[in-house]
């Protein structure tokens, strides 16, 4: 089994999503000691945002020297995603959405003819069979039923984007309200870690 571990938080040691994604990966390692883990830190090694040059290169246009390295990084990211049986993503909420570096990565793996295709009845995802676990952190409370639920363009987007690629086995390990005081923060993290441990059940 192969696991792709991605972090997108711009924070270091204080990142809740990084702490939780590491917990999730540790749970899968304990369950399968032979697990192969590939690590991708999108904050430390960002992928360039999609541009007209990237699209032209995908259609066979000559690649400039300035773009060549970034195209290779994007191709490697796609290959790592395709090879993974399990994908674990640390995804904090920034201004109601995901980190821009995570969006850049998603743009690079969303490739017509490779991870999805257009059929007679609309788009068809080609990545079914993968398991996705998202370690989600939020300063406020935006889960379903909360007054601020309409502001959630983080988990809702990720579910839609990966669903579009055919992934239906999606689990969110969520710690929210982490900016609303130390007690709520510690409680949210503890609850999320319990949910992560339950993945081994």
UniProtKB/Swiss-Prot annotation:
Coiled coil: none annotated. Signal peptide: none annotated. Belongs to the azoreductase type 1 family. FMN binds at residues 9, 15-17, 93-96, 137-140. HAMAP family: Azoreductase_type1. One of its GO terms (molecular function) is oxidoreductase activity, acting on NAD(P)H, quinone or similar compound as acceptor. Keywords: Flavoprotein, FMN, NAD, Oxidoreductase. SUPFAM superfamilies: Flavoproteins (SSF52218). It catalyses: 2 a quinone + NADH + H(+) = 2 a 1,4-benzosemiquinone + NAD(+); N,N-dimethyl-1,4-phenylenediamine + anthranilate + 2 NAD(+) = 2-(4-dimethylaminophenyl)diazenylbenzoate + 2 NADH + 2 H(+). It comes from Burkholderia lata (strain ATCC 17760 / DSM 23089 / LMG 22485 / NCIMB 9086 / R18194 / 383). Binds 1 FMN per subunit. InterPro entries: Flavodoxin_fold, Flavoprotein-like_sf, FMN-dep_NADH:Q_OxRdtase_AzoR1, NADH:quinone_OxRdtase_FMN_depd. Homodimer. Quinone reductase that provides resistance to thiol-specific stress caused by electrophilic quinones. This is FMN-dependent NADH:quinone oxidoreductase 7. Its cofactor is FMN. Its EC number is 1.6.5.-, 1.7.1.17.
């Amino acid at each position: 089994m192969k696991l792709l571990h991605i972090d997108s938080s711009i924070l270091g040691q204080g990142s809740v999503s990084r702490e939780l994604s590491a917990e999730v990966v540790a749970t899968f390692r304990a369950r399968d000691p032979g697990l192969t883990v590939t690590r991708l830190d999108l904050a430390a090694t960002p992928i360039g945002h999609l541009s007209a040059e990237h699209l032209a290169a995908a259609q066979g246009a000559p690649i400039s020297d300035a773009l060549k390295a970034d195209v290779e990084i994007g191709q490697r990211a796609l290959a790592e995603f395709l090879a993974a049986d399990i994908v674990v993503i640390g995804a904090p909420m920034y201004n109601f959405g995901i980190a821009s570096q995570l969006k850049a990565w998603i743009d690079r793996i969303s490739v017509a003819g490779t991870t999805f295709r257009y059929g007679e009845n609309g788009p068809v995802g080609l990545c079914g069979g993968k398991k996705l676990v998202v370690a989600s952190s939020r300063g406020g409370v935006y889960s379903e039923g909360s007054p601020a639920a309409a502001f959630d363009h983080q988990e809702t987007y990720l579910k839609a984007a990966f669903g579009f690629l055919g992934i239906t086995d999606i689990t969110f390990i969520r710690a929210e309200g982490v900016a609303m005081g130390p007690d709520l923060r510690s409680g949210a993290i503890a609850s999320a870690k319990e949910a992560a441990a339950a993945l081994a059940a």
